[in-house]
Amino acid sequence: MSEIDYKETLNMPKTDFEMRANLTTKEPLFREKWEKDNLYARVLEKNKNNTPFVLHDGPPYANGSIHIGHALNKILKDIIVRYKSMCGFYSPYVPGWDTHGLPIELKMLTDAKINYKVISPIELRKRASEYADIQIENQISQFKSLQLLTDFKKIYKTKEPKFEAAQLKLFKKMVLDGLVYKGLKPVYWSPSSQTALAEAEVEYHDVDSPSIYVALEIIDQNGSQKVKNGDKLVIWTTTPWTLLANAAVAIGENFVYCRVEHNNQGYIVAKELANKFIEISKLDNAQISVDFNANELIGIKYKSVLNDLVCPVVIGHHVSLESGTGLVHIAPLFGEDDFQIGTANSLEMIMHVEDDGVLNDAAGKYKGIFYEKANAQIFDKLTSKSALLAKGTIRHSYPHDWRTHKPILFRGTPQWFVSIDKIRQQLLNELESINTYPEWAKKRLVNMISERKDWTISRQRTWGVPIIIFYDKDGKPVINSAIFDYVIDLVEKYGTDIWWEKEADELLPEEFRSNGYTKEMDIMDVWFDSGTTSLAVEIDEKLKPPYDLYLEGSDQYRGWFNSSLINSVAYTHKSPYKQIVSHGFVLDSKGEKMSKSKGNVVDPLKVIKKYGADILRLWVANAEYTNDVNISDEIINQNSEIYRKIRNTIKFLLGNLNGYEYDESVKRTGVHQYIYNELESIKEKVYKAYDEYNFSSVIKTINKYVVELSSFYLNITKDILYVHEFDSNERMMTLANFYDITNFLIKAIAPIIPTTAEDAYMHFYKKNKLESIHLENFDIVKPYDSNVLKEWEEFFSLKDEVNLLLENAIKSGLIKRTNEAKVTIKNPSEVIKGYDLKQLLMVGAIEFGNVSKVESFMSEKCNRCWNHFSPAQIKDNLCPLCYKIVQKVNGK
C-alpha cells in the first residue's frame, strides 16, 4: 500500500460548518427563520410553567437611529433574557418606546418646517404621533439587526391610550393622597425650549461667565455702631442680569465682617476674604479698619443699584467663605436658596425674564433684551454709578438643556410638583431590599433619593400627557375623584388628544358643567411617563411588579430608576424592581466622548454590516460594562480574534464528531478523565459568571479554555482521532469528551453569539436534538473530582519546563520538530511516570534520569502517522500500531 493510499485508512475530520463565519450573510437568514418558526413564543411556551424572571425594558426615546449606546443596552438585556430562558426561567421581554416630549415635538416641527406658534395643538399632536410611529418602525428594524430574542409585534408605547389612562390613574392617586401640589418656585427653566426641566433633563458644560464685584450703598445703618451710612456692601455675582431682581443681601450668621477703607470710602466684606477682595479690586493702600459680627449688619438698608429698591440685609443659610465677599445678592425668583430667604423675609419677588429669556417691563430700560445680552449694558450702568469694583471671567460648570444644549436658568414660575418629602422614607426603605450591580451603585441611588428635591412634573408644551386639572372661576384647582375618573375613562377610549379636542365642559361629568371651569394646559414630564411603565405595561397577565431586573445606563440613577421608584412607591408602596444593573457610556479608543464634530462616532449598524452582529455582541459581552467602555476598529478586531478561536475550536470538534454516536457510559481514564473533570469545573465558572451578569468573565473563561484546549488536548489527541481504529477505546473516550465539550460550548456561547451557536448546532450530531439551540436548556454541573485537577497540576508544570527545552532545541537546530526529540526527565514522581508522556508531550521518546535534557535520537518516521520511532520498531515503514491497522484493512 502506497503512502497516498494510507490516507484512506485515516479517520479524517469532516463537517459542513464553515471556517469563515459569513455573519453578514447568515444573520438575516437566521433571523428570518427564527421569526418564521416563532422561536421567541416557543421559548416562552417551553418555560411557561416555570419560575418567572422578568427583565423590564426601559423605553428608549422614539427619535432618530439607534446609536452604539442603544446597542450596548439592548445586547446586554438580550444576553440576560436568553441565558435565563436557557436556565428554564419563564422570561418574557417586552420592548417599549418613550413617545412624548420636546425632542419629538421639535424634530417634527423642524422636519416639517412649521413654526410652533402657528400650528394648532391638535395638528401638532397628530404630526408628533405619526413621527414617533415612523421612528419606532425605523428603530425596530435596526434593533432586529442586533439579533434580539423578542416579538416586535408586541411592544408598548407611552402614547397608547391604555398606557396614558394608567398614567392618569397614578396621577389621580398622587393628587388625592396629597403628593401633588401647585406652587411658585424657582425651577430649571430652558429659554430655548420655553419649558421647565427636571434634574434628569439637565446636563453640565464648562462655560466662561462674567465675574463682578458690585458695591451697594448703605442708606440706613439701622443703629449700627460699626457701620456708617454711605459705606458700601460688596457682593460678588456671576449672573449680573439677576441684579435687576435684587431684593436683599444675605450674610453668614456666624461670620466676622470688616470695613475696608480706601480713599475715604468704606467697603463691607467678610474679614476672611478682605485681602482677596482688595487684591482683585486693586484697592492700593486700602486698610482694614474695624471688625464686627453679623449682628451689626442685620436690618441695615441699602439702595439696590439697578432697580432703585430699598432692600435689607438678612441672614442667609447658604452664604459661605469659599469665594466672593461673604455677602450674597438675593433675587428670590432666581435661585432655590434665594427663594427660601425671600419667603422667610417677605422680600420683593421680581420676575423680569419672560419664558423665552427676553427681559420684560420689570427690567425697565432693559426691556426686550435677551437676559444674557443685557450684561454689557448692566456693566456700563454699574460703572457710571461707581458700583463696579472689579470685572473678570470665571470658568465653571453651568447647567444646560439636555435637548438643545443651551444654557438654562433658575426661574420662579407656577408649576406642578410631586412632594418627595412625604414619601422619602418609604423610598429609602424600599431601596434597602434591592440589589445593584455594581454594588456601589446602591449607595449612589440612596444618596440621590435622600437629597432629591420636589419633582417638577409640569411642562409648558403640547406633545404629552395632560395634567388633568380643572380650575374654578377663582383660579383654584378643583380636586375631585369623580372628575378624574370621568376624564380617565375618556382617555382610555380616545387617547389624550381629547383634552385638546374638547372644551372644558365636555370633559366634565354633567353635574360639574356650566360652572365656568377652565383646563390646565401643561403636560407631564416625560420622566413621569416612563416612570409609570411598571404600572402601565402588561408583560403577562400573571406577572406583576416588582420585576426581577431593570438594566439601563448609569445616567438613569437620576432618570428612569429614580422616577420609576417614586411612581411605584406612590401607587403600590413597593419598589418596581428587585435588582438594578447599570452600564457606563461608550467612548472612543482614547476614552473620549463621541461626537459628530470630533468624527469619532461609531455606528453600530456599520459595525454589523462590516463584521456581523455576533462580533458586536461579543464586544459587549467582553467589555467591563459597569464602567465606561471603549470601542474602536482595533478593539473590534481583538474581539474578532477571540471569535475566530472559538469558531475554529468548534469546527475542529464538529469535524471529528462526524458520524459519532454519543455514549455517556464510556468510562474515561488518564488525560481523558482530567478533561472530563476540567470541563465540569469550567461549566461551574461560566454559569456563575452568567448568574452574576459578569459576561466579560464568561468570555475570558471560555477564551482561555479553548486556547488551552487547542494547545493541549485537541493537539495530543489528533493521533488518537486520525490514526487509531475508528472504534478504539481511547478514541471513544476522546470523542465522548469532544461531544461534551461541544455541547457545552455551543450552549455557553448561545446567549452571546446566537447566530454562531445556531449555525454550529445545526452541524452538531446531538442526541435528542431540538429545532434550535435556543430551545435547549443549560446542563447542570455534574459532580467532579477536584483532586484529579490538582493531581494534574504537577504534569502541567513539567510540560512548561519541557516545552522550554524543546523550543531551545528547535532554535539551536538540534531538532526540527518535537516528535524528533528524545526527552530525559529529571527524577519524576511515580504519578508522572504513570502517564503516557510520549503522547502527552508529543515527543519521539521519553527517558528518566538525573538531568532534564533534550536530544535528537536515531529514529525513523512512520509513513502513516508521521511520528518518529526507533528503527527497530518500524516495519514496512510503519509503526507497530499503523502496521496492525493497515494489515487489518488489507485483510491480513
Swiss-Prot record:
IleRS has two distinct active sites: one for aminoacylation and one for editing. The misactivated valine is translocated from the active site to the editing site, which sterically excludes the correctly activated isoleucine. The single editing site contains two valyl binding pockets, one specific for each substrate (Val-AMP or Val-tRNA(Ile)). ATP binds at K596. Catalyzes the attachment of isoleucine to tRNA(Ile). As IleRS can inadvertently accommodate and process structurally similar amino acids such as valine, to avoid such errors it has two additional distinct tRNA(Ile)-dependent editing activities. One activity is designated as 'pretransfer' editing and involves the hydrolysis of activated Val-AMP. The other activity is designated 'posttransfer' editing and involves deacylation of mischarged Val-tRNA(Ile). Its EC number is 6.1.1.5. Monomer. NCBIfam families: ileS. This is Isoleucine--tRNA ligase. CDD domains: Anticodon_Ia_Ile_BEm, IleRS_core. L-isoleucyl-5'-AMP binds at E552. It comes from Mycoplasmopsis agalactiae (strain NCTC 10123 / CIP 59.7 / PG2) (Mycoplasma agalactiae). GO terms for biological process: isoleucyl-tRNA aminoacylation. GO terms for cellular component: cytosol. A motif ('HIGH' region) lies at residues 60-70. It catalyses: tRNA(Ile) + L-isoleucine + ATP = L-isoleucyl-tRNA(Ile) + AMP + diphosphate. PROSITE patterns: AA_TRNA_LIGASE_I (PS00178). It is found in: Cytoplasm. GO terms for molecular function: aminoacyl-tRNA deacylase activity; ATP binding; isoleucine-tRNA ligase activity; tRNA binding; zinc ion binding. The lineage of its organism: Bacteria, Bacillati, Mycoplasmatota, Mycoplasmoidales, Metamycoplasmataceae.
